[in-house]
Amino acid sequence: MFERRAYLLDMTRRVPTMRTAQELIDILARYRYNEFRPFAEKGFPEELIDFGRIGAYCKMQGIEMVRTTRNDFEELFVRAEYAAVSTEAERSLAGRVEEMREQMIRAEAQGRARKASGFLVTDFSDECVWQPLCVSLPGIVMGGNFASGGARSSMMDLEKELDRVMEAPLGGLLLRLGTLYLRGGAVREHCSELYNILSHDIGYSRHPGLTQFVLDDVSGVARGVRIAAERWVERSDWAKEVVYAANLLDCACHRRDEVRLREVRDEHGHIWRLRFVPEGRVESLAKLPRF
């Protein structure tokens, strides 16, 4: 077990509501984290969220809150006190579950070999911040288990744990979305080509594996996940997020379909307001394509 078990949440482009922050802290406590690191590139958004209340809530759960800037984060690497790994939520739309799992295994082994005192799970934002919070859950859950349980955590039943966290049978659906980036073999480190297609209209022509047949296959799986998750949307905000993640992937497969894009733009605002303060929403929405 690592002495320090930390989760870093990037608040540079979007800031969670107090309710969301408390829900996240509850999840961290459940998976034996003892350090919560709100991150900002420079100044912290003091006017948007009460860090005093967050710190007090962390303390109630046996967690230390440590504000972290870019300089602080880089200093962690210089001191090499932590084995660091990403949730792989950024630049993904719906996650990169297998890449995340492999990184967890490597980070735990390397941290143990050099006797690192901490295990740090990072959850950075990308320039678009379209992905819903649920996309980070597999990394948070698995990271907590690796930090406290070591290498044997690679065999954990992640789907079952996600069902418990979301209090609904959504874990398998979320993991299914989180493996679609592997289709067609167009794999990049720390990025999904489906994200590239939606955000920059690139990827399709550069990767022969991403044929229209493959994109149609991804779209079909995403629609199936959406239909299954929709049965729970009246009872679970997590289900709403899973539906939205599925729709993002579907839009990436049909990037020039204005009807799909209009629907996901409408959904974007609703999902954002579930979890985050209003600031940043317009900037994120503006990056979704229009035709």
Describe each model-derived feature in a short phrase.
Residues A56, Q61-G62, E75-F291:
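Substrate-binding groove of N-acetylhexosamine-processing glycoside hydrolases
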